Regions:
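Glycine-rich phosphate/adenosyl-contacting loop at the front of the ribokinase-like
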Residues: 1-63, 67-74, 78, 246
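Conserved phosphate-binding/catalytic region of the ribokinase-like
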Residues: 1-5, 31, 155, 204-304
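Ribokinase/PfkB-type carbohydrate-kinase core domain
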Residues: 1-13, 75-88, 102-237
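Residues at secondary-structure transition points
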Residues: 33-41, 45, 67, 89, ...
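Short, basic and Ser/Thr-rich N-terminal targeting/leader segments
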Residues: 53, 92-94, 223
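Short glycine/serine/threonine/alanine-rich loop segments
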Residues: 55, 81, 161, 267, ...
Length: 304
């Protein structure tokens, strides 16, 4: 098999502005401490994290033939992500997320660009056959992929792949429309807010149990409080590790990378959860979503 994971996702860079300030309208200029252009997008950050752990990773998405698109493809390639299947369009513009990070929280403004343009029909059976697993993130942003995504997961299963989904946040805050998709999902990876919003449950464990009646395995990210995983037969929990947090951008995507590393290597669930929590925590020690992502050897120092 050529690839461990194929990611169908979005390709936008992040412009991260850090400082203890809030923007103010009225042509008021505020000074930030640092500014950096980094790999952005949940799918791309996940891809880099998985490759950093040693998985063979391929990516398919849509970007423009422009500065931001070329930046993303170059930076992902440097991190051993195969981008040969990315669709580059001359008649569209790669988007951008501007993130204002004041250390305790962050605000995000996104120009979606070509995020919504990937379709299920762009993902051939031949490409699927080269992979063991198919991962999709940013479900609510990939609007042209949404309608046929259940069929794409079905195609993947017929060809022997397992599937995973991280919806990420729903900008419309409607949180519906993917029950059929969850039923065809092997691993569902929401965070606490997403799990509670989707299920309308009053607590995380109840939310995870409800989701596990559809997806085969659910792992809920709880930030500094660790994580909780639920299948139809069991519930497992893991703590995180204490680190000096610089930037939480992409921590959930690094968690996903660690979780799917363990899942694809048939680890026990408790060990898989622990690696995921460690990967998420370690990634927050540097600015941007990918700079702090660990190699497997470093992450395993915290995994028994």
């Amino acid at each position: 098999m050529k690839f461990d994971i194929l990611i169908a996702g979005e390709i936008n860079p992040d412009l991260i502005l850090s400082g203890d300030v809030l923007p103010e309208f009225g042509q008021v200029e505020k000074l930030v401490e640092t500014a950096s252009l980094t790999i952005g997008s949940s799918s791309a950050i996940f891809a880099c994290g998985a490759a950093r752990l040693g998985l063979k990773v391929a990516f398919i998405g849509v970007c423009g033939d422009d500065v931001f698109g070329r930046f993303m493809l170059d930076e992902m390639s440097k991190r051993n992500v195969d981008v040969n299947n990315v669709i580059v369009r001359s008649n569209g513009q790669t988007g951008l997320s501007v993130i204002l990070n004041n250390r305790s929280d962050r605000a995000i403004l996104t120009h979606s660009g070509l995020i919504a343009e990937l379709r299920s029909s762009d993902i051939s059976d031949n490409l699927l056959r080269q992979s063991k697993h198919l991962h999709v993130a940013s479900y609510f942003l990939q609007t042209k992929l949404q309608p046929d995504l259940p069929n794409l997961f079905d195609r993947a299963h017929v060809l022997g792949l397992t599937t995973s989904l991280d919806t990420n946040y729903d900008p419309s805050e409607q949180w519906f429309g993917f029950d059929e998709l969850l039923s065809g999902t092997d691993v569902f990876l929401p965070n606490q807010v997403e799990a509670l919003s989707i299920t309308k449950a009053s607590d995380v464990e109840s939310a995870a149990r409800r989701l596990a009646t559809k997806a085969k395995l659910v792992a809920v990210k709880l930030g500094a409080n660790g994580s909780l995983a639920c299948s139809q037969n069991s519930v497992s929990k893991s703590t995180s590790i204490s680190v000096k947090v610089v930037d939480t951008v992409g921590a959930g995507d690094s968690f996903d990378a660690g979780f799917l590393y363990g899942y694809l290597n048939n680890w026990e669930l408790e060990k898989t959860l622990r690696l995921a929590c460690v990967c998420g925590a370690l990634s927050t020690q540097q600015a941007g979503g990918t700079s702090g992502q660990p190699i497997l050897k470093d992450a395993m120092k915290y995994v028994s």
